């Protein structure tokens, strides 16, 4: 393998310009997400979610974006997970969408709050049966002795709910992220990337700045 310091490539798929940038960051995000889906990217809704605990220790993990509604980015998770526990003590959050094939990325910085239970139940009911059962099976981030033990818990859960509707567990919920900043990055030749930062001024207005790469 060649040295890691020598692994690089040029970015040459295009430019993001003042003329092509949409004035609404949500519309720009929707356009880029549609481009990612159209390009056949695997897991185009996958995003890195960064949180910080009460001791100031950051953590990251990949989570799937499930909606953008009412100006908020939405995802769901076990409320006992590290990310949920972090957010319940420190609501600051960062999302990162890495669309490598398109030489694009989007950064979202803001604050998270819990979704209402009726929204959680509505989404939970739309999930595949196996995903509903898995949510009840897993005490996310807790130790377990083996995969066989996990599968045994899953089978027990299937029996428990074999003849009834499956409600959303109380320990499972969703978060909505209200962004304060949304940054769009397009790779450029000679590492002269295009970066535009939307910063929230109030509930409906954003300032826009081009940033140096």
From Swiss-Prot:
It holds the Pfam family PNP_phzG_C. Substrate binds at residues 8-11, 66, 123, 127, 131, 191-193. Pathway: Cofactor metabolism; pyridoxal 5'-phosphate salvage; pyridoxal 5'-phosphate from pyridoxamine 5'-phosphate: step 1/1; Cofactor metabolism; pyridoxal 5'-phosphate salvage; pyridoxal 5'-phosphate from pyridoxine 5'-phosphate: step 1/1. Keywords: Flavoprotein, FMN, Oxidoreductase, Pyridoxine biosynthesis. It comes from the Bacteria. GO terms for molecular function: FMN binding; pyridoxamine phosphate oxidase activity. Its EC number is 1.4.3.5. Catalyzes the oxidation of either pyridoxine 5'-phosphate (PNP) or pyridoxamine 5'-phosphate (PMP) into pyridoxal 5'-phosphate (PLP). Homodimer. Belongs to the pyridoxamine 5'-phosphate oxidase family. This is Pyridoxine/pyridoxamine 5'-phosphate oxidase. It comes from Pseudoalteromonas atlantica (strain T6c / ATCC BAA-1087). The lineage of its organism: Bacteria, Pseudomonadati, Pseudomonadota, Gammaproteobacteria, Alteromonadales.
């Amino acid at each position: 393998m060649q040295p890691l310091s020598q692994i690089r490539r040029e970015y040459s798929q295009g430019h993001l310009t003042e003329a092509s940038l949409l004035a609404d960051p949500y519309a720009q995000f929707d356009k880029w997400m549609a481009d990612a889906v159209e390009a056949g990217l695997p897991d185009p809704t996958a995003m890195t979610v960064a949180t910080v605990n009460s001791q100031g220790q950051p953590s990251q993990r990949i989570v799937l974006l499930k909606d953008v509604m009412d100006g908020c980015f939405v995802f769901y998770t076990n409320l006992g997970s590290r990310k949920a526990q972090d957010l319940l003590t420190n609501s600051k959050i960062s999302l990162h969408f890495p669309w490598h094939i398109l030489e694009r990325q989007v950064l979202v910085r803001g604050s998270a709050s819990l979704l209402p239970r009726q929204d959680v139940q509505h989404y939970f009911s739309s999930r595949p049966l196996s995903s509903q059962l898995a949510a009840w099976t897993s005490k996310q981030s807790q130790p377990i002795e083996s995969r066989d033990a996990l599968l045994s818990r899953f089978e027990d859960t299937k029996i428990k709910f074999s003849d009834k509707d499956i409600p959303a567990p109380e320990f499972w919920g969703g978060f909505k992220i209200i962004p304060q900043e949304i940054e769009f990055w397009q790779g450029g030749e000679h590492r002269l990337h295009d970066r535009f930062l939307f910063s929230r001024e109030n509930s409906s207005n954003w300032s826009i700045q081009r940033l140096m790469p």
